[in-house]
Amino acid sequence: MAIVNGAVGKPQHISDMVDSTKMNGNQSQDTAGRADTPVSNGGQDYLHVFDSRTCNIHHIPVSDGFVRGSDLSTIAAPLKGSSGRMQKLAVLDPGFQHTACKESSITFIDGEKGELRYRGVRIEDLFHDHDFDSTLHLLVWGRLPTKEEKIKFERRMFEVASPPQEVCDVIRKLPKNMDFISMFLTGLSTYMGTDEEMTRSRHQAVMTYHKNLQTTDDAIIRCFSYVSATLATVYCHVKGVELHHPQEGLTLVENFLHMIGMEDPDKKISRTIDRLSINMADHELSCSTAAFLHVASSLTDPMTCLLTAISAASGPLHGGALEVCYQGLELIGSVDNVPAYIAAVKAKKFRLFGYGHRVYKIQDPRAALTKELMEEHREAIDANPLLQIAVEIDRQANTDPYFVERKLKLNADFYGCFIYIALGIPRDMIPGLLTISRMGGLMAHWREAMNNPIKIWRPMQKFKL
């Protein structure tokens, strides 16, 4: 099969695409045409595809660099070993590296330029000029809130911010040395069980959330508070400290810090977590967001989807990378061991967490903002003995041809742990805080899905003997 790019222009013959002696007047189906058929673009771009199996030419519309899978599936050829049965063309794309499964108006990324925007607003502008609650509002409802809208938004989160007794009782029965994410998921599962609307939605034919934005918006507010309150409850249980009641008039992050009893008189801690959270609020269809939406396509409740997303994010190749990156620095032990470690990475014996990203071909814009935050906490971060190891890895990887030629640059995970630890946040609680960070993007994608036609996500596979 040969593919030739079609450009907008004059009507053209494409008989020179193939050896005319091979055509033999064969007709193709659907979008197909003969080699001697002129193609009028009429302002539309096409791929002109010659199928050597059938000697047919197909004209596949191209829109903004994408072709639709349904258009490709109009290309068919006899199935080998069958008596004339036709097999539609499909795409094999392990890891979804070249496949878009949805259209979205939420987040834009240009990996070649290192550009990230939420609803058209540059990540740098949000980081410097707005807080996390405003960013949540922007992501979910498509605009930065007015002062009145922000007050109302924060009040609504406060009204559902106290965890029910059932949640507290379940969490307090868990061993304090249990894996933090396991405790977090247990608490959230219990919280979900206390929400009658969500549990009822799984057992009725009438769709609770789809095309019902008021119900969807109310559920989004509850989800924000459920996650924050559960994380605070788990933290207080592990640390053996009192869980404080939420306080009206505080932001989501400020209330979380208040509930765990962390003193923040000058709001330096909350403002830092706010900006770290803005940095991680959404990233198109990350692994966890895709997992969330995969489950959401069955029209279950948002907390069920969220449990799936948190589980996906806990893996070392995704949200767990921040913690694993820090553990890697501990294993290296000293600056003197960095050259040997870099050599082992190049020999593919180890993975260098915190470097490289599937999307970005230059430095992740979030990494630059993380470095900026580090300067505000320089004294506490400099006291961390692992920092010099990280700096030396960064220096060597940034100049080594192996990394440069492969366009492997610093990403948002590499230095993130240093800031959380400098703030006094326990390392095992960082994945939970990252969940709060990602809530805006997850809820925005869910709301977008609930407002659009639904098809259950059911990828194909290629059977292999």
Swiss-Prot record:
It holds the Pfam family Citrate_synt. Belongs to the citrate synthase family. The keyword Transferase applies. It comes from the Eukaryota. Keywords: Transferase. The active site is at H357, D413. Residues 13-40 are annotated as: Disordered. Citrate synthase-like protein; part of the gene cluster that mediates the biosynthesis of squalestatin S1 (SQS1, also known as zaragozic acid A), a heavily oxidized fungal polyketide that offers potent cholesterol lowering activity by targeting squalene synthase (SS). SQS1 is composed of a 2,8-dioxobicyclic[3.2.1]octane-3,4,5-tricarboxyclic acid core that is connected to two lipophilic polyketide arms. InterPro entries: Citrate_synth-like_lrg_a-sub, Citrate_synth-like_sm_a-sub, Citrate_synthase, Citrate_synthase_AS, Citrate_synthase_bac-typ, Citrate_synthase_sf. One of its GO terms (cellular component) is mitochondrial matrix. One of its GO terms (molecular function) is citrate (Si)-synthase activity. It is an enzyme of class 2 (transferase). Induction: Expression is induced on squalestatin S1-producing YMG medium. Its EC number is 2.3.3.-. Residues 21-31 have a biased composition (Polar residues). Pathway: Secondary metabolite biosynthesis. Disulfide bonds: none annotated. GO terms for biological process: carbohydrate metabolic process; tricarboxylic acid cycle. This is Citrate synthase-like protein.
